[in-house]
A protein has these predicted regions:
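Acyl-CoA-dependent O-acyltransferases
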Residues: 1-222
Length: 222
Protein backbone atom coordinates (compact mmCIF):
# COMPACT_ATOMS: atom_id res chain seq x y z
CA UNK A 1 0.00 0.00 0.00
CA UNK A 2 2.87 2.38 0.78
CA UNK A 3 6.49 2.71 -0.21
CA UNK A 4 8.86 2.38 2.74
CA UNK A 5 9.75 6.09 2.74
CA UNK A 6 6.21 7.21 3.56
CA UNK A 7 4.89 4.21 5.50
CA UNK A 8 6.28 5.10 8.93
CA UNK A 9 5.01 8.69 8.76
CA UNK A 10 1.55 7.58 7.63
CA UNK A 11 1.31 5.04 10.45
CA UNK A 12 2.47 7.62 13.00
CA UNK A 13 -0.28 9.94 11.82
CA UNK A 14 -2.83 7.14 12.09
CA UNK A 15 -1.74 6.36 15.64
CA UNK A 16 -2.04 10.02 16.59
CA UNK A 17 -5.58 10.24 15.19
CA UNK A 18 -6.65 7.05 16.94
CA UNK A 19 -4.98 7.94 20.25
CA UNK A 20 -6.76 11.29 20.42
CA UNK A 21 -10.11 9.55 20.81
CA UNK A 22 -9.14 6.46 22.80
CA UNK A 23 -10.02 6.40 26.49
CA UNK A 24 -7.02 6.07 28.80
CA UNK A 25 -3.32 6.45 28.09
CA UNK A 26 -2.61 3.36 26.01
CA UNK A 27 -1.04 3.76 22.59
CA UNK A 28 -2.33 1.53 19.78
CA UNK A 29 0.24 -0.56 17.95
CA UNK A 30 0.96 -0.07 14.27
CA UNK A 31 -0.68 -3.43 13.44
CA UNK A 32 -3.80 -2.39 15.37
CA UNK A 33 -4.17 0.96 13.59
CA UNK A 34 -3.54 -0.42 10.09
CA UNK A 35 -5.97 -3.27 10.74
CA UNK A 36 -8.53 -0.76 12.01
CA UNK A 37 -8.04 1.50 8.98
CA UNK A 38 -8.67 -1.36 6.56
CA UNK A 39 -11.63 -2.66 8.57
CA UNK A 40 -13.23 0.78 8.61
CA UNK A 41 -12.75 1.12 4.84
CA UNK A 42 -14.23 -2.34 4.28
CA UNK A 43 -17.25 -1.38 6.37
CA UNK A 44 -17.79 1.62 4.10
CA UNK A 45 -17.40 -0.60 1.02
CA UNK A 46 -20.11 -2.90 2.39
CA UNK A 47 -22.40 0.06 3.07
CA UNK A 48 -21.90 1.35 -0.50
CA UNK A 49 -22.82 -2.10 -1.88
CA UNK A 50 -25.80 -2.85 0.34
CA UNK A 51 -27.10 0.62 1.14
CA UNK A 52 -26.68 0.14 4.88
CA UNK A 53 -24.12 -0.71 7.51
CA UNK A 54 -23.57 -4.44 7.94
CA UNK A 55 -22.14 -6.37 10.86
CA UNK A 56 -18.73 -7.89 10.28
CA UNK A 57 -16.41 -10.38 11.91
CA UNK A 58 -12.63 -10.07 11.93
CA UNK A 59 -10.13 -12.88 12.44
CA UNK A 60 -6.52 -11.87 13.16
CA UNK A 61 -3.66 -14.35 13.41
CA UNK A 62 -2.05 -14.64 16.84
CA UNK A 63 1.24 -16.43 17.50
CA UNK A 64 0.94 -18.61 20.61
CA UNK A 65 4.71 -18.98 21.08
CA UNK A 66 5.68 -17.33 24.35
CA UNK A 67 2.04 -16.59 25.17
CA UNK A 68 0.91 -19.83 26.81
CA UNK A 69 1.75 -21.27 30.23
CA UNK A 70 3.08 -24.57 28.87
CA UNK A 71 6.60 -24.91 27.43
CA UNK A 72 7.14 -24.83 23.67
CA UNK A 73 10.48 -26.11 22.31
CA UNK A 74 12.71 -23.35 20.93
CA UNK A 75 13.29 -25.35 17.76
CA UNK A 76 9.60 -25.99 17.03
CA UNK A 77 8.40 -24.91 13.62
CA UNK A 78 5.18 -24.57 11.66
CA UNK A 79 2.00 -22.67 12.41
CA UNK A 80 1.23 -22.43 16.13
CA UNK A 81 -1.59 -19.91 16.16
CA UNK A 82 -5.04 -19.32 17.55
CA UNK A 83 -6.59 -16.19 16.07
CA UNK A 84 -7.91 -13.15 17.88
CA UNK A 85 -11.55 -12.36 17.07
CA UNK A 86 -13.39 -9.05 16.85
CA UNK A 87 -16.87 -7.91 15.82
CA UNK A 88 -18.45 -4.82 14.36
CA UNK A 89 -22.15 -4.48 15.12
CA UNK A 90 -24.06 -2.18 12.80
CA UNK A 91 -25.61 0.77 14.62
CA UNK A 92 -29.29 1.47 14.11
CA UNK A 93 -28.40 5.08 13.29
CA UNK A 94 -27.23 4.77 9.70
CA UNK A 95 -26.15 8.42 9.65
CA UNK A 96 -23.78 8.02 12.57
CA UNK A 97 -20.17 8.57 11.52
CA UNK A 98 -17.99 5.51 11.93
CA UNK A 99 -14.67 6.57 13.48
CA UNK A 100 -11.22 4.97 13.33
CA UNK A 101 -10.91 4.65 17.12
CA UNK A 102 -14.12 2.57 17.14
CA UNK A 103 -12.31 -0.12 15.14
CA UNK A 104 -9.00 0.31 16.97
CA UNK A 105 -10.78 -0.47 20.24
CA UNK A 106 -12.34 -3.62 18.84
CA UNK A 107 -9.09 -4.89 17.36
CA UNK A 108 -7.22 -4.14 20.59
CA UNK A 109 -9.87 -5.80 22.77
CA UNK A 110 -9.86 -8.91 20.59
CA UNK A 111 -6.08 -9.24 20.78
CA UNK A 112 -5.97 -8.57 24.53
CA UNK A 113 -8.63 -11.23 25.11
CA UNK A 114 -6.55 -13.74 23.17
CA UNK A 115 -3.46 -12.79 25.21
CA UNK A 116 -5.39 -13.25 28.48
CA UNK A 117 -7.00 -16.53 27.43
CA UNK A 118 -3.73 -17.93 26.09
CA UNK A 119 -1.92 -17.25 29.37
CA UNK A 120 -4.28 -19.74 31.04
CA UNK A 121 -3.29 -22.61 28.72
CA UNK A 122 -1.14 -24.99 30.78
CA UNK A 123 -1.87 -28.41 29.25
CA UNK A 124 -2.55 -30.14 25.95
CA UNK A 125 -6.23 -30.38 26.87
CA UNK A 126 -6.39 -26.64 27.53
CA UNK A 127 -4.76 -25.94 24.18
CA UNK A 128 -7.08 -28.28 22.29
CA UNK A 129 -10.17 -26.82 23.97
CA UNK A 130 -9.10 -23.25 23.20
CA UNK A 131 -8.41 -23.94 19.52
CA UNK A 132 -11.65 -25.91 19.02
CA UNK A 133 -13.70 -23.20 20.72
CA UNK A 134 -12.18 -20.51 18.49
CA UNK A 135 -12.66 -22.51 15.30
CA UNK A 136 -16.28 -23.26 16.21
CA UNK A 137 -16.98 -19.57 16.74
CA UNK A 138 -15.32 -18.73 13.41
CA UNK A 139 -17.36 -21.32 11.51
CA UNK A 140 -20.62 -20.08 13.02
CA UNK A 141 -19.83 -16.48 12.04
CA UNK A 142 -18.65 -17.49 8.57
CA UNK A 143 -22.02 -19.02 7.76
CA UNK A 144 -24.03 -15.97 8.82
CA UNK A 145 -25.61 -14.48 5.70
CA UNK A 146 -25.93 -10.98 7.15
CA UNK A 147 -22.31 -10.48 8.21
CA UNK A 148 -19.04 -9.93 6.35
CA UNK A 149 -16.01 -12.03 7.27
CA UNK A 150 -12.41 -10.74 7.09
CA UNK A 151 -9.17 -12.64 7.73
CA UNK A 152 -5.98 -10.80 8.71
CA UNK A 153 -2.48 -12.22 9.04
CA UNK A 154 0.66 -10.43 10.22
CA UNK A 155 4.29 -11.40 9.65
CA UNK A 156 5.49 -8.14 11.19
CA UNK A 157 8.58 -8.42 13.41
CA UNK A 158 9.61 -11.65 11.72
CA UNK A 159 13.27 -11.21 10.64
CA UNK A 160 12.61 -12.21 7.04
CA UNK A 161 15.08 -9.67 5.66
CA UNK A 162 17.90 -11.26 7.66
CA UNK A 163 17.48 -14.69 6.05
CA UNK A 164 20.41 -15.72 3.85
CA UNK A 165 20.40 -19.13 2.14
CA UNK A 166 23.81 -18.51 0.61
CA UNK A 167 23.00 -16.08 -2.18
CA UNK A 168 22.47 -12.97 -0.08
CA UNK A 169 19.66 -11.40 1.90
CA UNK A 170 16.39 -10.67 0.06
CA UNK A 171 15.88 -7.33 -1.65
CA UNK A 172 12.14 -7.66 -1.21
CA UNK A 173 10.14 -10.28 0.66
CA UNK A 174 6.47 -10.72 -0.12
CA UNK A 175 3.47 -13.00 0.19
CA UNK A 176 2.63 -13.08 -3.50
CA UNK A 177 -0.05 -15.77 -3.43
CA UNK A 178 -3.08 -14.85 -1.32
CA UNK A 179 -5.78 -17.47 -1.97
CA UNK A 180 -9.39 -16.37 -1.77
CA UNK A 181 -10.94 -13.00 -1.05
CA UNK A 182 -11.35 -10.82 2.05
CA UNK A 183 -7.83 -11.82 3.09
CA UNK A 184 -5.23 -9.30 4.29
CA UNK A 185 -1.55 -9.93 4.87
CA UNK A 186 0.86 -7.58 6.69
CA UNK A 187 4.63 -7.51 6.34
CA UNK A 188 7.34 -5.12 7.49
CA UNK A 189 8.86 -2.76 4.96
CA UNK A 190 12.56 -3.44 4.49
CA UNK A 191 14.11 -0.15 5.54
CA UNK A 192 11.93 1.20 8.32
CA UNK A 193 9.09 0.58 10.73
CA UNK A 194 6.37 0.64 8.10
CA UNK A 195 3.90 -2.01 6.98
CA UNK A 196 3.09 -3.46 3.58
CA UNK A 197 -0.53 -4.57 3.39
CA UNK A 198 -1.43 -7.17 0.76
CA UNK A 199 -5.15 -6.96 0.09
CA UNK A 200 -7.24 -9.63 -1.64
CA UNK A 201 -10.82 -8.64 -2.53
CA UNK A 202 -13.43 -9.31 -5.17
CA UNK A 203 -12.86 -7.00 -8.13
CA UNK A 204 -15.94 -4.85 -7.48
CA UNK A 205 -15.02 -4.51 -3.82
CA UNK A 206 -11.45 -3.60 -4.71
CA UNK A 207 -12.61 -0.74 -6.93
CA UNK A 208 -14.65 0.71 -4.06
CA UNK A 209 -11.86 0.06 -1.58
CA UNK A 210 -9.30 1.92 -3.68
CA UNK A 211 -11.59 4.95 -3.85
CA UNK A 212 -12.22 5.06 -0.10
CA UNK A 213 -11.11 8.49 1.21
CA UNK A 214 -9.23 7.01 4.18
CA UNK A 215 -7.32 4.57 1.99
CA UNK A 216 -6.45 7.29 -0.51
CA UNK A 217 -5.26 9.59 2.27
CA UNK A 218 -3.19 6.83 3.89
CA UNK A 219 -1.50 5.87 0.62
CA UNK A 220 -0.86 9.46 -0.40
CA UNK A 221 -3.41 9.48 -3.22
CA UNK A 222 -5.95 11.76 -1.57
Amino acid sequence: MLDSQNSTLAISNLKAVASANIHGSRQPTRVEVVTALLWKALTMVARAKHGRLRPSFLVHSFNLRGKIAMPVPDNSFGNFTNPALARFTADEDENKKVELDHFVDRVHDGIRKRVTDSAKISSDDDLFSSVVSTKTEMIEEFHRSDADFYMFNSWCRMPVYEVDFGWGKPGWFSAVVVPGHNIFHFMDTKDDDGIEAWVSLEEDDMLLFQENPDIKAFTGQG
